[in-house]
């Protein structure tokens, strides 16, 4: 029998339907793979008993012909999604051994469709990071290595555990969240496919909040088709989330293989950065050529406020985080560090419970929201955000259907290599992705090639609001042209 972990989600669905193998066999294969890959530190909690119970239930439904669209498919859940009865910590010491008494909307919908939970995945603490180095459970290793090197690289962040687990064939797909690039950047670093849907497409209810006006859930998967299948189950209106949009969820899988003839692709001149590696520039040109060969039309476009996106993002996101994280005080749940009085209890708990990067962002956020600086920083950043959104609206109003850019400014780097002395060095990893969150648009990262050291590189496609279908159609063109990449196993 084929190694079951090497199948795509779509192939596994066919095999389960044909009864070539059972969900229990598929789940056991992935549980064994997880056990053998603990050095990657992708999972922070494994749930083998629950996984086998869910797999048996899926097998029963498949036998009766009553199976959901993801019946029997083993998935990993980022540790930001509330999972009833299973520890959820946002990879922060401050949440301790918090066990939710409720299920997030997104995970509920995956279980409704028959998916199997293998466990909880590592992520940057409260999703704050671009390398999955800020987790209280330690850094995640990228299954990819530079040719001829034993250096362990970062998988990107904040959803590094999701990307690493999918790339290392530990799960068939994973949930993730994207606030400034946390799905797309790790996907590009690991040769996986990651889509950040339009803001409001997936419910945020039951997901630990970082920056509420920017956070959006999405999947990381092995192929464009797999990500389309997962998004269909994850998306949908939820009255429990006031930002959830009540519009029908299309059959995203139907967009795969659809002709892209006549689709207008914008190439934004502002994304050509000084000092951009020649490999990234070449990959971008190749991606454009593949889309043109498939019948798409290329047009140069201008997004003039792009250069202000990163500084504006690093004002808006920490401001919202400082408000959202005020609830972690050691009183009702999670870590509690005693003090002589209530103020000291708060101070001790937060000082001990939050990691350095989270403390930094909370302090930045508190500063920009303070009375003397609100107008100078936060208000101006929100005005810039409006201008960034308008840049995209103007571009789409001229008939552009999607925009092609690089996903990241480089390939993956070594653990501890960046951001030690200067956090801005790490923040620059988000340079191509933050605009999408600021404008609330959908964006997909697709593997498109490798650098000179054999590390994967990705391209990003940005779409019109709620037009994820076009991104799947275009993403599949890039996937077909570039091929799929898997890392050589070293663990």
UniProtKB/Swiss-Prot annotation:
Annotated catalysed reactions? L-glutamyl-tRNA(Gln) + L-glutamine + ATP + H2O = L-glutaminyl-tRNA(Gln) + L-glutamate + ADP + phosphate + H(+)
Q: Name one GO cellular component term.
A: glutamyl-tRNA(Gln) amidotransferase complex
Task: Name one process (GO BP) from the record.
Answer: translation
Q: Which InterPro entries match?
A: Amidase, Amidase_CS, Amidase_dom, AS_sf, GatA
Which sites are catalytic? 158, 182
> Which keywords does the record carry?
ATP-binding, Ligase, Nucleotide-binding, Protein biosynthesis
Named from the GO MF annotations, one term is: ATP binding
Can you tell which superkingdom this protein's organism belongs to? Bacteria
Which EC number(s) does the record attach to this protein? 6.3.5.7
Matching PROSITE patterns: AMIDASES
Tell me which family the UniProt entry assigns to this protein: Belongs to the amidase family. GatA subfamily.
Q: What does this protein do?
A: Allows the formation of correctly charged Gln-tRNA(Gln) through the transamidation of misacylated Glu-tRNA(Gln) in organisms which lack glutaminyl-tRNA synthetase. The reaction takes place in the presence of glutamine and ATP through an activated gamma-phospho-Glu-tRNA(Gln).
Instruction: Describe, as the record does, how this protein assembles with itself and its partners.
Output: Heterotrimer of A, B and C subunits.
Question: What HAMAP family does this protein map onto?
Answer: GatA
Q: What is this protein called?
A: Glutamyl-tRNA(Gln) amidotransferase subunit A
Originating gene? gatA
């Amino acid at each position: 029998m084929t190694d079951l972990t090497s199948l795509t989600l779509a192939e596994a669905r066919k095999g389960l339907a044909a009864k070539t193998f059972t969900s229990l066999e598929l789940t056991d294969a992935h549980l064994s793979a997880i056990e053998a890959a603990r050095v990657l530190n992708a999972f922070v909690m494994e749930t083998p008993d629950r996984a086998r119970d869910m797999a048996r239930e899926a097998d029963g439904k498949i036998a009766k012909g009553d199976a959901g669209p993801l019946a029997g498919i083993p998935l990993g859940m980022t540790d930001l999604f509330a999972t009833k009865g299973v520890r959820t910590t946002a990879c922060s010491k401050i949440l301790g051994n918090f066990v939710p008494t409720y299920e997030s909307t997104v995970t509920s919908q995956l279980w409704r469709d028959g998916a199997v939970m293998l466990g909880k995945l590592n992520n940057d603490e409260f999703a704050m990071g671009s390398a999955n180095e800020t987790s209280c459970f330690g850094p995640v290793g990228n299954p990819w290595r530079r040719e001829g090197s034993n250096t362990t690289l970062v998988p990107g962040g904040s959803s590094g555990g999701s990307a690493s687990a999918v790339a290392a064939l530990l799960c068939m797909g994973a949930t993730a969240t994207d606030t400034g690039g946390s799905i797309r950047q790790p996907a590009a670093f690991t040769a996986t496919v990651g889509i950040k849907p339009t803001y409001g497409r997936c419910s945020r209810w039951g997901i630990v909040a970082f920056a509420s006006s920017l956070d959006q859930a999405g999947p990381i998967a092995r192929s464009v088709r797999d990500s389309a299948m997962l998004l269909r189950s994850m998306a949908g209106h939820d009255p429990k989330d006031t930002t959830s949009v009540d519009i029908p969820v299309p059959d995203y899988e139907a967009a795969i293989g659809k002709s892209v003839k006549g689709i207008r692709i914008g190439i934004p001149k502002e994304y050509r950065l000084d000092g951009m590696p020649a490999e990234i520039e070449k990959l971008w040109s190749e991606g454009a050529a593949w889309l043109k060969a498939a019948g798409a039309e290329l047009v140069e476009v201008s997004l003039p406020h792009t250069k202000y996106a990163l500084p504006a993002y690093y004002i808006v996101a920490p401001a919202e985080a400082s408000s959202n994280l005020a609830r972690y005080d050691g009183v009702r749940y999670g870590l509690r560090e005693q003090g002589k009085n209530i103020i000291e209890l708060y101070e001790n708990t937060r000082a001990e419970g939050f990691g350095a990067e989270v403390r930094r962002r909370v302090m930045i956020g508190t500063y920009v929201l303070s009375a003397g600086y609100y107008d100078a920083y936060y208000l101006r950043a929100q005005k810039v955000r409006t201008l960034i959104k308008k840049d995209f609206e103007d571009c789409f109003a001229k008939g552009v259907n999607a925009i092609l850019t690089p996903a990241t400014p480089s390939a993956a780097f070594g653990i501890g290599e960046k951001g030690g002395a200067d956090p801005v060095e790490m923040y620059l990893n988000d340079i191509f992705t933050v605009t999408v969150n600021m404008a609330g648009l959908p964006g997909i990262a697709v593997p498109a090639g490798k650098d000179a050291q054999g590390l994967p590189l990705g391209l990003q496609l940005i779409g019109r609001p709620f037009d994820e279908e076009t991104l799947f159609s275009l993403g599949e063109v890039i996937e077909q042209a570039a091929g799929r990449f898997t890392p050589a196993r070293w663990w």
